[in-house]
Amino acid sequence: MKYSDLRDFISQLQQMGELKRINMPVSPYLEMTEICDRTLRAEGPALLFENPTGHTIPVLGNLFGTPQRVALGMGATDVSELRKIGHVLAMLKEPEPPKGFKDMLGLGSLVKSLWDMTPKERRDAPCHDIVWEGNDVDLARLPIQHCWPGDIAPLITWGLVITKGPHKKRQNLGIYRQQVIGRNKVIMRWLAQRGGALDFREHSIANRGQPYPIAVALGADPATILGAVTPVPDSLSEYQFAGLLRGSRTELVKAIGSELRVPASAEIVLEGHIYPDESHPSGYEHALEGPYGDHTGYYNEQDTFPVFTIDRITMRRDPIYHSTYTGKPPDEPAILGVALNEVFIPLLQKQFSEILDFYLPPEGCSYRMAVVQMKKAYPGHAKRVMFGVWSFLRQFMYTKFIIVVDEDVNIRDWKEVIWAITTRVDPTRDTTLVDNTPIDYLDFASPVSGLGSKMGIDATNKWPGETDREWGTTITMTPEVKKRVDQIWQELGI
């Protein structure tokens, strides 16, 4: 299914019984978090809070609270179809010469589809229906959630941050949380390795002393939102990929105060700059961010990040504010990880044909632990796969633990994974520790902020060269006996 904008998606979710409208007044301060958390854990619907306490703008929560709704947002009808998207991305990342006429036609069709999905720029747009400028710019007028009791301030969570580096042809889309610190100021928390931070760093070197323009889109269409969290090849625009998911070109409009292009159908757009401040070593305004409850289930440490000053807020008529919360798994990021896991698999298999399956357990905070099922071919093969996964996609840079198992182990069943670890692993021989690697800043378990270690666990059967002992043989029943018992099972009355 395809959706022209967020409102179209909401309408179709409601028809499918996947969205619940809440008419009762509910406060953005803590109450929405508790309601959304209970609903997500029950695999319930998306929630549209129509009367947030103290505000007239409705709040949309739990939008991607089930893998099925993530799949719907990506234009699929079921989670199983997401692997097709992964196959497309794998081909775009590393295209192969066509093996025959049929392959050539297929490749040509995909290239044409991508060309046809070049974003379309409009002269006017719904997101410019209403414009707040000057003293009218006041974030307190938006129903921004205060998610947890220990959070320092309200937090913008689902903002699609749009940036552009001075030497890049295309814009970057990323989702970074933003702490409200004033009527027109937020702290832009982006890690140094993320696209937005890299764009800003390039600007601060090339154009030091010049304000850095940013736009933040709230309530874009689902394909554009999900395109921003998908491992799109660097050569492909997230807007272009969103068009491919949607089946129609992404419509953009020029921001009023900069050259950035924003989604024309976005519900709300924040426009502004990171302004110079020579009192900070970077030459730009910074502030201390946090603490906030995050996807680890803990409150994180404070750290310093750039301040984004909002010069204007534009919006559609009767806008909808899209929000979420992060907390101990499962939360929305964990659910997104479950769905995007299916997109990752073809990408990994394209690079490492020995990988049969790949799983990011949601309990592992979306990406901190990965389990890999492989077809082992030689001694030490599992270690090659570990380092391959760590280095292949940016998404796995922060994966702390990788467990590798053989093809006879179902990696989505923890009972089988634990059985493999406890019967096939010698802790000294089969664990690989790597020091001083990039780690999520939110991971307070690391000895240094942003830098820590990783562990690989080889839970495969060991081959000659890996052990001098005779390796155990797995116990299995004969096929003949299984078939016989299948035939008489009903008669046994068990």
UniProtKB/Swiss-Prot annotation:
Active site, UniProt feature: D294
InterPro entries, alphabetized: UbiD, UbiD-like_C, UbiD-like_N, UbiD_bacteria, UbiD_Rift_dom
Compartment(s): Cell membrane
Cellular component, GO annotation: cytosol; plasma membrane
Keyword terms of this UniProt record: Cell membrane, Decarboxylase, Flavoprotein, FMN, Lyase, Manganese, Membrane, Metal-binding, Ubiquinone biosynthesis
The enzyme's E.C. designation: 4.1.1.98
Gene Ontology terms for molecular function: 3-octaprenyl-4-hydroxybenzoate carboxy-lyase activity; metal ion binding
Record's catalysed reaction(s): a 4-hydroxy-3-(all-trans-polyprenyl)benzoate + H(+) = a 2-(all-trans-polyprenyl)phenol + CO2
Any single biological process term in GO: ubiquinone biosynthetic process
One Pfam family of this chain: UbiD_C
Amino acids binding prenylated FMN: I175, Y176, R177, R189, W190, L191, R194, G195
Domain of life per record: Bacteria
Cofactor details (free text): Binds 1 prenylated FMN per subunit.
Binding site for Mn(2+): N172, E238
Cofactor(s), names only, from the UniProt record: prenylated FMN; Mn(2+)
Presence of keyword Metal-binding: yes
Membrane topology: Peripheral membrane protein
Pathway the protein takes part in: Cofactor biosynthesis; ubiquinone biosynthesis
Protein's UniProt keywords contain Membrane: yes
Role: Catalyzes the decarboxylation of 3-octaprenyl-4-hydroxy benzoate to 2-octaprenylphenol, an intermediate step in ubiquinone biosynthesis.
Subunit structure: Homohexamer.
Family: Belongs to the UbiD family.
Name the UniProt record assigns to this protein: 3-octaprenyl-4-hydroxybenzoate carboxy-lyase
Source organism of this protein record: Herminiimonas arsenicoxydans
